Amino acid sequence: MERDLAAAIATAMAEILGGAIALQMLFHIPIKVGSMLILVVVLFCEFTNAYKRIEKLIMLFVSLIGFCFLIEICMVKIDWGAAATGWVKPVFPSHAMPVIMSVLGAVVMPHNLFLHSEIIQSRKWNLKEEAVIQRQLKFEFKDTLFSMIIGWAINSAMILMAAATFYQRGENRVDDLTTAGNMLTPLLGNEATVIFAIALLLAGLSSSITAGMAGGTIFSGIFNKPYGIATKETRQGVLITMIPAALIILLIRSPFQGLIYSQMLLAVQLPITIFTQIYLTSSKKVMGKYANSTGLKMVLWAIAIVVTALNIGLFVTGF
């Protein structure tokens, strides 16, 4: 649990930083000041809204993020054939392992698996009826799958936009989000920069909120209590997640490298979560008749081995 709380802090740092960079792009607010503003807004949302309201707020943000990137994708010329090939047979440039692992960590976000589980468990159901249990399991599966697909789609949209906008036009050195946003202006017009910044701000806010909720869920779980913003454990978990994340931003020199390595840490932690969850969901003692089938276990172990191999590759290449 402590490792997953650290993962939540790493995520919160990246999301607060992303929101702060967006504020800098939109209003020229210094990143460190912007980080504190994002922290205040997120804590206000966490502590003053019931979960249902936060859930609706996050759904609104995610919808707007998707809409923003849809507009940006429509503004550039995408080589969809090359994109399809890249999805199936990706090419890994030299020294790109930290970026690859950071994308993996950003999409999967191991701490959110605990948040998804808590969301399902928090609903009041009659768990003595087989039909209700089956419905719960299907809902959990769909909730997690939908979240993963949305995360994958938004990350893919950003990669496609970067490839079509920068690299096809010879801009091969983009190592800062602010620079990336500014470079969109001469290529696509000022509207593209504003849309990019708005999407980044919404992504930072929504992801920071979920990171705080995940931290609250994990910390409450340490004391065997459910998530509830009115409880002491949940509030402490949110604060333990969000405040250190914001303080770390005040200490780092390169915001962009901070983003990369914080998300890379999530990927490094991912095998621990995967192996633990495979063990628990495959245990008949824990899951009873709902334990993983032999075929599903083989698939899950294969995924775990691949993710572990990627992490080994990360350390072998020396970052």
Q: Where are the regions a protein language model picked out?
A:
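Hydrophobic alpha-helical segments and their helix-loop junctions in multi-pass secondary transporters
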Residues: S63-K89, M97, L104-I120, T276-K285, ...
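Select transmembrane alpha-helical segments in multipass membrane proteins
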Residues: M1-A6, F92-L104, W152-A162, P186-L205, ...
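C-terminal membrane-solvent junction of multi-pass transporters and transport-like membrane proteins
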Residues: L57-L60, T217, T231-Q236, P255, ...
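Helix-loop-helix module between adjacent transmembrane segments
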Residues: M1-E15, A20-A50, G105-A106, L202-S207
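Membrane-interface loop-to-helix entry segments
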Residues: L37-I38, E46-V76, M264-L266, L270, ...
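Transmembrane alpha-helical segments of multi-pass small-molecule transport proteins
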Residues: M1, L26-T48, L64-F69, G228-L247, ...
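Extracellular/periplasmic helix-exit of transmembrane alpha-helices
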Residues: I120-E129, I149-T179
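Loop-to-transmembrane helix boundary motifs in multi-pass membrane proteins
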Residues: S35, F146, E191-T193, L205, ...
